[in-house]
Amino acid sequence: MSISSKIRPTPRKPSRMATDHSFKMKNFYADPFAISSISLAIVSWVIAIGGSISSASTNESFPRFTWWGIVYQFLIICSLMLFYCFDLVDHYRIFITTSIAVAFVYNTNSATNLVYADGPKKAAASAGVILLSIINLIWILYYGGDNASPTNRWIDSFSIKGIRPSPLENSLHRARRRGNRNTTPYQNNVYNDAIRDSGYATQFDGYPQQQPSHTNYVSSTALAGFENTQPNTSEAVNLHLNTLQQRINSASNAKETNDNSNNQTNTNIGNTFDTDFSNGNTETTMGDTLGLYSDIGDDNFIYKAKALYPYDADDDDAYEISFEQNEILQVSDIEGRWWKARRANGETGIIPSNYVQLIDGPEEMHR
């Protein structure tokens, strides 16, 4: 059996976390910014519509296009409330921003026509559209910015649900991780590490030794192997292994001839790199690697981390795991940008380190 068949990862079960977009008023009540801004918008809209009706009912001339601006603003307010209740604000941010920008133009145009007109009733209507223009400008700043922007983070910090996850940061994070993925097969790493530790590396001068191109995920070389499991590299890997086997055997034979005292040691080293990987030592190492996420003991998860934001695992990566905000995770390796972790339900895999925070004691779990 070749090594490529032994390191093929077992597919992970689909994530159990599903996003609920059912109608819930608590989604609206849990956001202070939504309640305060929409409430002010409703009050301003009532002032504008009241002043407009009073002004139009008299003999005073009233700009007719203002009626459409007031109706359009009402549709925007109702749409915002529905987006919050269905928890779809992040899905329609571009639509919300552009729609509010149009309403801002309508209201500022109406304010220009009403401010310089005569009559107290028109003054009330102009005050309403001016307030709506100010609120629309604040909405454009908030909904037009990413959730990772300083203003949005400060506003969302008052929300009961906490800071919203940033789609932009998430996309950049995954793109950076894909770009830094190691292109060296796991088999090469096993051989390179063993040759370097056994002292044979100096005997093969001129023979190219590929090295891992990154250590972004975890400190162990086992995880680097999981990032490259394409079957189209198996032929090149087998050719490399056979060539390396011949070189190691040659070096081992030369070592036996020159120094009989090291005969047993060199024989063990040569047998370790069997082409079919039938040796017990190598089999044990691969078994430990395959059990990296499934059979790891409780003692290895010596850290605890609290999730700062919710995270949805990438469907293309079988070793990412999803988690909820404020969820407590057990972590076994805290080096690099990706940590090995386990959820309370036993699901194990890797998590982005910038989405969690290490905690020291039980008192920090409830903060």
Curated annotation (Swiss-Prot):
Residues 252-276 are annotated as: Disordered. It is found in: Cell membrane; Bud; Bud neck; Cell projection. Glycans are attached at N59. Its main location: membrane. It comes from the Eukaryota. Pfam families: SH3_1 (PF00018). One of its GO terms (cellular component) is cellular bud neck. It is a multi-pass membrane protein. Residues 1-32, 87-93, 144-367 are cytoplasmic. Plasma membrane osmosensor that activates the high osmolarity glycerol (HOG) MAPK signaling pathway in response to high osmolarity. Detects changes in external osmolarity and activates PBS2 through the stimulation of STE11 and targets PBS2 to the plasma membrane. PBS2 activation leads to changes in glycerol production that helps to balance the intracellular and external osmotic pressures. Activates also HOG1 in response to heat stress and mediates resistance to oxidative stress. Involved in the regulation of the mating pathway. May be a receptor that feeds into the pseudohyphal growth pathway. This is High osmolarity signaling protein SHO1. The gene is SHO1.
